[in-house]
């Protein structure tokens, strides 16, 4: 959750530790749009252009063109999305290894992290960096049962049964 940013809860996982089971859990229980936060250097190395030249998103979320890894089938299954995320983590991956557009939505974090932009993209990449992992994380907004955004304390109730914590 960000205090001055989007004021919503996201589930976050490290890209280096992704599994199909974790993707399935997140999409089932968080229910929002699954995205992949990445550092700018990864976006540049993989030649992932911004989705739109002039970003008019009020929060400044930096979506790139969507991607699927070249070995995936439809791209949408938890297995295919985990495969794509693992490929984004791989330092040997090349731009031609990805189909564009795809079913995974990379978001580019600001270099200054949460000090530059107080968003879930930057928070998740910062967490990956602090863990000594590649600057790749997967995130998903937490929705209420009725489909509206879960705000605190609602999102805490959604994650509490699973032993997940809150980081502000």
What are the roles of these predicted feature ranges?
Residues 1-167:
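Catalytic domains of riboflavin
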């Amino acid at each position: 959750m960000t205090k001055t940013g989007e004021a919503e809860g996201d589930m976050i996982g490290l890209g280096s530790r992704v599994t199909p089971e974790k993707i399935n859990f997140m999409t089932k229980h968080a229910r929002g749009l699954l995205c992949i936060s990445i550092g700018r250097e990864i976006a540049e190395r993989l030649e992932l252009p911004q989705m739109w030249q002039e970003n008019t998103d009020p929060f400044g979320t930096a979506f790139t063109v969507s991607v699927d890894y070249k070995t995936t089938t439809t791209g949408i299954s938890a297995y295919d999305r985990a495969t794509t995320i693992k490929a984004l983590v791989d330092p040997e991956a090349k731009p031609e290894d990805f189909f564009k557009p795809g079913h995974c939505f990379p978001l580019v974090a600001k270099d200054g992290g949460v000090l530059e932009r107080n968003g879930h993209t930057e928070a998740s990449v910062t967490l990956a960096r602090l863990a000594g992992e590649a600057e790749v994380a997967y995130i998903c907004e937490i929705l209420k049962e009725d489909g509206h955004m879960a705000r605190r304390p609602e999102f805490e109730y959604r994650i509490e049964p699973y032993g997940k914590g809150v980081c502000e």
